[in-house]
Amino acid sequence: MHDFDGRTAVITGAGSGIGAALARRAANEGMNVVLADIQETQAREIATAIGGDRALAVRCDVSDEASVAALADAAYARFGTVDLLCNNAGIVPGGRHRKVWEYGLGDWQWSLGVNLYGVVHGMRAFVPRMIAAGRPGHILNTASVAGVVSGSGSACYGAAKHAVVRATEALYAGLKEIGAPIGVTMLCPGLVKTGIYDAERNRPAAFVESDDPISESAELEAMREELYRNATTAEEAADIAFDAIIADRFYAFTTTAFDPAIRQRADDILARANPSFDDIVAMSRRDAGLDREPSASEPHAA
């Protein structure tokens, strides 16, 4: 996809972070922009800055199928077509670093609801309409480096992102099989300066783990700040995504720091070997240009 001027982008999670940066980049390319976010006020502020005639803010809970269907209806009613779909919304359940068996069911339901079903609902609501329009277009699904590496940490987040990777590969293959003029890019951010770790403020009451209150140590907060100082900016991530869209390239990574782990995982699978993996926090530190040994409680890549 090369011609953006006058066309329409729909971006979920557009109220902050990578989503907001994608919205601004789309607007700078001359696109109409539909900004979807559960935090409607933030989305409206960005839409106002872009310009009322070219931007529409919609409150949307991507974990809810009806909410995403309403988003699609609003986008088509306002602009008549959707040419670029960015299924970008994502969250990381907060609290202490847990092993896979320590996450509550609410953590799993919330993570899968936003990180996986948000993408599924977006594809179901928009892709058939984009195909029917017969216009060149593009779909960007935001996965994560956590979706292509192994490890014990951030299990309910990583599991959802692994599923997004597989779903996005299937989307790419399916569109190629029917000859649709729609490209697909899978964005896999490493450590990016966003508010993804602050998503607890938006956790639905139904998914709150009342028997396991969220708490994070001062050490963890300090470590996160250290990592973020040299992390990729949301604007840089958005530029990487748009470069891939323009080049019609499937994979878009914000860093090469995780390449050894990706290669090792593939080698282990082909060798039928037991998994061997580098700690994702250590890889995040390399991504941020830090070299001291990480503690066991450090945050994981977004």
What are these regions (language model features)?
Residues 174-256:
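SDR active-site lid
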Residues 96-100, 104-109:
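Substrate-binding pocket helix/loop in short-chain dehydrogenase/reductase
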Residues 123, 160:
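Active-site helix of classical SDR
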Residues 8, 15-16:
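Conserved glycine-rich cofactor-binding loop
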Residues 29-45:
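Conserved glycine-rich Rossmann-like NAD(P)H-binding loop of the short-chain dehydrogenase/reductase
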Residues 40-41, 59-70, 105:
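The beta1-alpha1 cofactor-binding region of Rossmann-like NAD(H)/NADP(H)-dependent oxidoreductases
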Residues 144:
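Residue(s) in the substrate-gating loop at a strand-loop-helix junction
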